Amino acid sequence: MKVSKEKWEKNFSEWLDWVLREAEIYDYGRYPVKGMGVWMPYGFKIRQNVLQLIRKLLDETGHEEVLFPLLIPEDLLKKESEHIRGFEEEVYWVTKGGSQDLDVKLALRPTSETSITFMESFWVKSYKQLPKKYYQIVSVFRYETKATRPMMRLREITTFKEAHTLHETYEDAARQVDEAINIYKAFFDELGIPYMISKRPEWDKFAGAEYTIAFDTILPDSRVLQIGTVHHLGQHFTKAFDFKIQRKDGSLDYPHQTSYGISDRVIAVLIAINGDDHGPVLNPVIAPIKVVIVPIPAKDEETTAKIINYAKEVGENLKNRGITVVIDDDKEKTPGEKFYIWELKGVPLRIEIGPKELNNNTVYIKRRDTFEGKSVPKDKAVEEVNTLLEKIKNDLHEKALKFLKERIIYTEDLNEAKKILEERAGVVEVPWCGDNNCGLQLQDVTNARVLGIPLDEDKDVSNAKCVMCKKPAKSLLRLAKTY
């Protein structure tokens, strides 16, 4: 069955606002502080399921969860000069306690490298204690001066998972970067989110990092959104805090660090990438409700009561197998109204039970993603539901991956690159000489952002010329219109 996607594709921004509000996921724009939204119960459950997955992946790889204070003293935040230069225009400052002026300004945490390094200097004294891998899931605050957008560009990022690790050598930290990349690949793959992995250019790396690796995806309007970053911090922060440890050879030296984070954007992408004009199609992995059962009333009350009891029996069978299910037996709503509501909420499967199913001892199961339906014997319902949920998960990932790949275009012609970015957006890959000046000029002439060097493909550009200066190319460079 062909499913309409016109609103989703052509008016994505309005579609997302509509879905978040009407599906009761996230109330944005009405709370009286710009750039701050409210997680509603249904959305909060989606958020919990996403965080449960990332916690599992981090815990399994030796990370330990911590919780640091929200407030960071000004002198602590400014310890690493390059770092504060990258954030100083975005920091919220607390300057009063009640009516009293504070002796030291306190920042609302924009990120936690400085506060975590400060505390690590008390905790870690020897290479024997390494590696250390910490993470926390907290709110961070950044005074965004660009137009704010729900979940994607916020002043309070409420779902900020930041990991911070400590290592004896640069090479150990580099290996941790690789582990972090693999953790995020497993995370996004399980969620069905397609991604590109790029090494950010020097001018766009994290403030205070040796280098930054980023995960990006393409949204329905063909603009690109950053969904995760991994930073090799080297010794920048440990030197700033004069934090040394004893090494294996007995000498004292500054340890090396990494940090990596994801945010609310992951949930925005989960809602966005598999939508249609009926609403989102949630991946069963994170759907708070995997199955909704809608009893279809009969003409007489006695048969209707039997249908509802039948539906409850089917529901219990599903619950006993660990499948989250809701039975919508609200007498005030018609079946059509119920279908509309649960489609808008993106519930992966709907089971309809009416007089026909009651008489035939069957259930009618309908997929949210394709709207394809089939009758199944009641005693096979659990088995069929499990099969369909797995198929929906895989099909959604496959469709999203196809969508992304179709929007990555290679060209060796600068004018063509400009035209593609202007007319179609998506991602353009061009040959690049490696010179930062050429990269910055590319941003200017294309009115796009350089995402960096692809790390997830190895296209040979040895015979190509840089699109800007015509010198021999050293690598590909990705360009895109971004959020």
Swiss-Prot record:
Tell me if Nucleotide-binding is a UniProt keyword of this record.
yes
Spell out the protein name for this chain: Proline--tRNA ligase
Which reaction(s) does its UniProt entry say it catalyses? tRNA(Pro) + L-proline + ATP = L-prolyl-tRNA(Pro) + AMP + diphosphate
A GO CC annotation recorded here is:
cytoplasm
- Enumerate the CDD domains for this protein: ProRS_anticodon_zinc (cd00862), ProRS_core_arch_euk (cd00778)
GO MF terms, alphabetically ordered: ATP binding; proline-tRNA ligase activity
EC top class named in words = ligase
| Function per UniProt | Catalyzes the attachment of proline to tRNA(Pro) in a two-step reaction: proline is first activated by ATP to form Pro-AMP and then transferred to the acceptor end of tRNA(Pro).
KW Transport (keyword) present:
no
Cite the record's note on assembly: Homodimer.
Keyword terms: Aminoacyl-tRNA synthetase, ATP-binding, Cytoplasm, Ligase, Nucleotide-binding, Protein biosynthesis
Entry's free-text remark on domains: Consists of three domains: the N-terminal catalytic domain, the anticodon-binding domain and the C-terminal extension.
One Pfam family in the UniProt entry: tRNA-synt_2b
InterPro entries per the UniProt record, alphabetical: aa-tRNA-synt_IIb, aa-tRNA-synth_II, aa-tRNA-synth_II/BPL/LPL, Anticodon-bd, Anticodon-bd_dom_sf, Pro-tRNA-ligase_IIa, Pro-tRNA-ligase_IIa_arc-type, Pro-tRNA_ligase_II_C
Protein EC: 6.1.1.15
Provide the protein's localization.
Cytoplasm
Tell me which Gene Ontology terms the entry assigns under biological process.
prolyl-tRNA aminoacylation
